[in-house]
Amino acid sequence: MTIFDNYEVWFVIGSQHLYGPETLRQVTQHAEHVVNALNTEAKLPCKLVLKPLGTTPDEITAICRDANYDDRCAGLVVWLHTFSPAKMWINGLTMLNKPLLQFHTQFNAALPWDSIDMDFMNLNQTAHGGREFGFIGARMRQQHAVVTGHWQDKQAHERIGSWMRQAVSKQDTRHLKVCRFGDNMREVAVTDGDKVAAQIKFGFSVNTWAVGDLVQVVNSISDGDVNALVDEYESCYTMTPATQIHGEKRQNVLEAARIELGMKRFLEQGGFHAFTTTFEDLHGLKQLPGLAVQRLMQQGYGFAGEGDWKTAALLRIMKVMSTGLQGGTSFMEDYTYHFEKDNDLVLGSHMLEVCPSIAVEEKPILDVQHLGIGGKDDPARLIFNTQTGPAIVASLIDLGDRYRLLVNCIDTVKTPHSLPKLPVANALWKAQPDLPTASEAWILAGGAHHTVFSHALNLNDMRQFAEMHDIEITVIDNDTRLPAFKDALRWNEVYYGFRR
């Protein structure tokens, strides 16, 4: 069972009574056939539920009102099978607060050249019914997604499925609670921000709990539960000699397991699905949570270090989007560079907290090594390299008057040399279009040093996310040129300034 099993998407057909009962009967029959086929064959992440025809303003308004108040409804897919006068949709769309997609399709793929008549034309009017619907969306300044293609087309299936992921993610975000264990890393700017504005814009709440509250739960974990979890570690990971039974760091592993169990219990009891820690606020914990955080991220929790609640929330959101897709998604940080002509590279990592979902190794190494930052006992961590291939890094920043999402398309590569003295998980990548352009554009746009790294999601996914939440997006990819990028930043400043 996945999060998508908790939601459904309503399939709504727009028509009118102008064409008579026989046409409406055929419309209903076609709709039932299409919905059944999509649910059976399209591999959509969640179920489509066919709703009664929307043929009058009252019917359409009732559907939209019901969608708002049904917690299982993640959004609406609308098909204008015949012409559906768009003034009928105004009241419903005015109140609708769920994501909306127009499926611009028709029942037949090919025209029946020899038999086509006006009855056929009146029945199959998506071509101009969809345009009427599009006008009212534009007139109302209500942006909605549009997917064009025959309902049996695999590309259309993939695009609808991608939109569904965004719709479910948006509903999950409205209920997302972010727990901050301690506050921000002191004096850091980009990890701070307006939590009230974030809750208004995205729906997630951010609150702080004292580390002492967490410590109390950690200390309540039984030795039996700790030993059982360590048994799981031994089956899942390659344990270094120091972490094995009778190893000199075995106690550190036991303590890491206790912290993991305590953290998970605290998060579950509070209904949290994202959290932050900071190495400056660890009072009562014996070590900085590393292994615990890595494993919780792999289970779907959002996380970021140093109190960075925006990145923690974004990671949870992207984890939901990517559920069931190939590739992993993790907290990440641009750490250091490799400058070499035509082969500039970025080494990404963090002190400890990189999600094993992006690991190339089937069994990462579990080790305990010294960490100078934080002033605590040596922490346990998983060490691994990252899968290669196309990926993205994304950053959500607070500009005061708006949120900006930055996305850099990257290509992860194999580490050319071993890193025997680097005791943390890492990722190595080439930034698009090149490191100078990518880094300068990122810096000019105010991108954070913390990001969400993903092999599972792509630029189109993040564009949809930005559109669905009505926030600015700036893209750095192979098409980026700095003069045009700077111009776009200036234009965006004017555009969003007018919208205030």
Swiss-Prot record:
<keyword id="KW-0119">Carbohydrate metabolism</keyword>
<keyword id="KW-0413">Isomerase</keyword>
<comment type="similarity">
    <text>Belongs to the arabinose isomerase family.</text>
</comment>
<feature type="binding site">
    <location>
        <position position="306"/>
    </location>
    <ligand>
        <name>Mn(2+)</name>
    </ligand>
</feature>
<dbReference type="InterPro" id="IPR055389">
    <property type="entry name" value="AraA_N"/>
</dbReference>
<keyword id="KW-0054">Arabinose catabolism</keyword>
<dbReference type="InterPro" id="IPR038583">
    <property type="entry name" value="AraA_N_sf"/>
</dbReference>
<comment type="pathway">
    <text>Carbohydrate degradation; L-arabinose degradation via L-ribulose; D-xylulose 5-phosphate from L-arabinose (bacterial route): step 1/3.</text>
</comment>
<dbReference type="GO" id="GO:0005829">
    <property type="term" value="C:cytosol"/>
</dbReference>
<feature type="binding site">
    <location>
        <position position="350"/>
    </location>
    <ligand>
        <name>Mn(2+)</name>
    </ligand>
</feature>
<dbReference type="InterPro" id="IPR004216">
    <property type="entry name" value="Fuc/Ara_isomerase_C"/>
</dbReference>
<feature type="binding site">
    <location>
        <position position="450"/>
    </location>
    <ligand>
        <name>Mn(2+)</name>
    </ligand>
</feature>
<dbReference type="InterPro" id="IPR055390">
    <property type="entry name" value="AraA_central"/>
</dbReference>
<dbReference type="GO" id="GO:0008733">
    <property type="term" value="F:L-arabinose isomerase activity"/>
</dbReference>
<dbReference type="GO" id="GO:0019569">
    <property type="term" value="P:L-arabinose catabolic process to xylulose 5-phosphate"/>
</dbReference>
<keyword id="KW-0464">Manganese</keyword>
<comment type="subunit">
    <text>Homohexamer.</text>
</comment>
<dbReference type="Pfam" id="PF02610">
    <property type="entry name" value="AraA_N"/>
</dbReference>
<dbReference type="InterPro" id="IPR024664">
    <property type="entry name" value="Ara_Isoase_C"/>
</dbReference>
<feature type="binding site">
    <location>
        <position position="333"/>
    </location>
    <ligand>
        <name>Mn(2+)</name>
    </ligand>
</feature>
<comment type="function">
    <text>Catalyzes the conversion of L-arabinose to L-ribulose.</text>
</comment>
<dbReference type="Pfam" id="PF11762">
    <property type="entry name" value="Arabinose_Iso_C"/>
</dbReference>
<keyword id="KW-0479">Metal-binding</keyword>
<protein>
    <recommendedName>
        <fullName>L-arabinose isomerase</fullName>
        <ecNumber>5.3.1.4</ecNumber>
    </recommendedName>
</protein>
<dbReference type="InterPro" id="IPR003762">
    <property type="entry name" value="Lara_isomerase"/>
</dbReference>
<dbReference type="Pfam" id="PF24856">
    <property type="entry name" value="AraA_central"/>
</dbReference>
<dbReference type="GO" id="GO:0030145">
    <property type="term" value="F:manganese ion binding"/>
</dbReference>
<dbReference type="InterPro" id="IPR009015">
    <property type="entry name" value="Fucose_isomerase_N/cen_sf"/>
</dbReference>
